[in-house]
């Protein structure tokens, strides 16, 4: 598994299972990585386009930050106009993926009871180890949001609703 991060977060990335850590401030992952089966993109479209190039033939790029694809339009039962808009939003990246012999899909993250139950079991058993950066009391919600907006959180930012 490979990831990009700043040099300051290299040890954290390795502790979470990364075999290869690339300092995005100094290196271009596109020139270092190749022949991956799957890419999970949480960055911008420019990074997503680079990610397509590190996949092996028939590889898959999954983006949680967009652009939404036609399947997403169907999944949310969008009206015909919105389906057309969604299709247009991802037309460029889908075309580039096809030219490279890989596929692209958009994954819309949402809370679903059954999935959350499964995730809870994985956390409780230690399979998933969430990284919590900071915990804010409820009355400091604005501070928590401001911290998230800095883009410098190293894990989850939690807002504690009530005292235990």
Regions found by a protein language model. Name each.
Residues 1-164:
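Terminal helix/beta-alpha structural elements that buttress the NAD(P)+-binding lobe
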């Amino acid at each position: 598994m490979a990831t990009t991060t700043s040099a300051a977060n290299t040890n954290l990335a390795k502790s979470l299972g990364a075999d290869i850590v690339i300092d995005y401030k100094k290196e271009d992952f596109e020139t270092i990585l190749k022949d991956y089966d799957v890419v999970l993109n949480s960055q911008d479209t420019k990074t997503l386009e680079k990610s397509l190039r590190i996949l092996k033939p028939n590889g898959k790029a999954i983006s949680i930050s967009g652009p939404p694809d036609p399947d997403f339009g169907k999944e949310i039962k969008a009206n015909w106009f919105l389906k057309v808009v969604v299709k247009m939003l991802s037309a460029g990246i889908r075309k580039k993926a096809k030219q490279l012999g890989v596929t692209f899909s958009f994954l819309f993250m949402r809370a679903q009871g059954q999935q959350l139950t499964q995730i809870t079991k994985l956390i409780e058993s230690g399979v998933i180890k969430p990284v919590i950066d900071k915990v804010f009391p409820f009355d400091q919600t604005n501070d928590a949001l401001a911290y998230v907006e800095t883009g410098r959180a190293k894990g989850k930012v939690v807002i504690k609703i009530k005292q235990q």
